[in-house]
């Protein structure tokens, strides 16, 4: 029995891609406390950017810094889920992969803090 993937095109492909993207975002939100914390932080801070007396470019930078944190967290979550699927045993390389993903999230958080402090200072 062959498992053939159907290649969708045009608007259908876009609709399916959007569906699966939202499905992934929902799965990450429901399974990861860090994703929930970052989404709630964004829900508070993004409206705050419109109350601040900053330029449009600064507002975009503030919002982008928050989105980078969420994007990095989503990628880290994907790496962790894949690692857990491969093996739940303690393994040096799986531990390194998870640590590297965590480091990426940490760097994105530092970047966001630096961006907010620099613009608001």
Predicted regions, residues:
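Hydrophobic alpha-helical transmembrane segments
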Residues: 1-78, 86, 90-98, 102-121
């Amino acid at each position: 029995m062959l498992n053939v993937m159907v290649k969708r095109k045009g608007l259908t492909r876009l609709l399916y891609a959007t569906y699966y993207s939202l499905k992934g975002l929902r799965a990450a939100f429901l399974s990861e406390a860090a994703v929930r914390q970052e989404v709630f932080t964004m829900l508070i801070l993004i409206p705050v950017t419109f109350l601040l007396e900053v330029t449009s470019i600064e507002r975009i930078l503030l919002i982008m810094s928050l989105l980078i944190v969420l994007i990095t967290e989503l990628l880290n979550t994907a790496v962790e889920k894949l690692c857990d699927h491969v093996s739940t045993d303690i393994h040096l390389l799986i531990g390194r992969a998870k640590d590297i993903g965590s480091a990426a999230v940490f760097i994105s958080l530092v970047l966001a803090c630096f961006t907010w402090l620099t613009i608001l200072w």
